[in-house]
Amino acid sequence: MIDITKISGIGPFIKETKQLNDFNSRDLFKIESNNKAFLVVNKNTIELRTDNKLGKLLINKYESVMESRYFGCGGLEIVSSADQLEPAELEDLIRLSYNLTKNL
């Protein structure tokens, strides 16, 4: 899994862990200034915000990318074990999600 602290262009954030049940938890990464989530890390997936056109493009391009359950339309859910996206692409998507969320 990616280390968010090593991604350039990410400002102050808060990490909250929510226990979903006895076996699963979810890490929410929120922007410190507005307390809005920009990244959700589940056991096997990550979810982030994106713009609609880029989201549709990535959903059509990769089998491991689908619409986010957390963010809904305008968000992506990526199966982390599939390794279809390069680490640099994933970092760019996380940075984009941070910047989109910062402006909400």
Residue map of PLM features:
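Charge-dense, helix-prone N-terminal extensions
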Residues: 1-104
